[in-house]
């Protein structure tokens, strides 16, 4: 399984993906995934969560997750790590 790292304290990205399967992977950081549009399934730690417009998911360090994208989906990803949290307190 792929393990992703974040090389800066904070990052925001927008993406649009057509029907596909995004393989299961793990993070060393926090990620907020906001669904702007589209439908599919988000798998988090082997739990299935159908999604559609307006859904928000929080992925924490060590969680595994993947997507089954059923219709073209637009995402907003907000990624941050412990350094960002500690510097904001």
Please describe what each predicted stretch is.
Residues 1-56, 69-71, 83, 89:
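Generic protein-terminus/edge-of-domain signal
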Residues 59:
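Glycine-rich, highly charged phosphate/nucleotide-binding loops
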Residues 62-85:
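Ligand-binding loop in jelly-roll beta-barrel domains
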